[in-house]
């Protein structure tokens, strides 16, 4: 099954997430099919908190990809902004 989930990056205590499409069996931070954007939970000032290609996300959802709970809420948030 194909899922849309977050892959963690960044330093210790400073998380930064890439929003990726991956096979469910792949490791969290491992192999992925396509990168859709990023999420920075610790963004301050002028830094961008969320960048997501909504069109690509919609295309993957139409193909049957299942978003994680957090990614589903981020997609909804990105649609409001766009």
UniProtKB/Swiss-Prot annotation:
One cellular component (GO) term of this entry: small ribosomal subunit
- InterPro entries per UniProt: Ribosomal_bS16, Ribosomal_bS16_dom_sf
Report the domain of life of the source organism. Answer: Bacteria
Record's keyword terms, sorted: Ribonucleoprotein, Ribosomal protein
Pfam families tied to this protein: Ribosomal_S16
A single MF term (Gene Ontology): structural constituent of ribosome
GO annotation (BP), single = translation
Q: Which SUPFAM superfamilies match?
A: Ribosomal protein S16
* Keyword Membrane attached: no
Q: Which NCBIfam families match?
A: S16
Which protein family is named in the record?
Answer: Belongs to the bacterial ribosomal protein bS16 family.
Name assigned to this protein: Small ribosomal subunit protein bS16
In its UniProt entry, the species of origin is given as Francisella philomiragia subsp. philomiragia (strain ATCC 25017 / CCUG 19701 / FSC 153 / O#319-036)
Q: Upper taxonomic classification of the species?
A: Bacteria, Pseudomonadati, Pseudomonadota, Gammaproteobacteria, Thiotrichales
């Amino acid at each position: 099954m194909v899922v849309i989930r977050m892959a963690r990056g960044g330093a210790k205590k400073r998380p930064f997430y890439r929003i990726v499409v991956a096979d469910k069996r792949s490791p969290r931070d491992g192999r992925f099919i396509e990168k859709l954007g990023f999420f920075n939970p610790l963004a301050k000032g002028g830094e961008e908190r969320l960048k997501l290609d909504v069109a690509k996300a919609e295309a993957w959802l139409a193909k049957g990809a299942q978003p994680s709970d957090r990614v589903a809420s981020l997609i909804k948030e990105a649609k409001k902004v766009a």
